[in-house]
Amino acid sequence: MYKRQILACGCFWGPEIKFSKLNGVYKTEVGYCGGNTSKTSYQEVCEGDTNHAEVVKLDFDPNIISYEKILDYFFEIHDPTTLNSQGLDFGTQYRSEIFYLNDNQKNIAKKMIEKYNKILSGKIVTKLSQIKNYCTAEEYHQKYLEKR
C-alpha cells in the first residue's frame, strides 16, 4: 500500500524530477498547497494572493523507502534555512514546508526538523502544516524538466 507526502521546497520543477528518481517513489505530481482557496492557478500563486506554496505530491512504498528517508532527501535538496526563497526564486510560494496527513507524519517531521536544526548552520524555517487546499498544477508544469 502506497503512502503519500506533500512537500514544498522551492520551485516545484526541480524537486519533482529529483523525487521521481528515488527508489520506492512511484508517482509524483506538482501542485499548490496551503493556501486560502480550494482552487488556484499558477498566475494567482505568483501574484501572492492565495498564500499557496508550490509543492510536490509523491506516492511512495514504505516497504522500499521510509518517510524519514524522504524527509532526509527533502532537507538535502533545498535550503531549509532561507525564508520564502530558494536560489534566485523569491516569494511565499517558494517557502520550505512539510504538509502532513496524520499525527504520525507530523511527529516524525518534527523530529526531522529538530535533527536538521542541529546539523545545519542556520535555523530551519521549514513550516509544518496539515494538508490544506491542495490542487494539481496545470498540465504544462507536470514533468516539466523531463519534457525539456
Describe the residue ranges of each PLM region.
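Flexible coil/turn and secondary-structure edge motifs
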Residues: 2-148
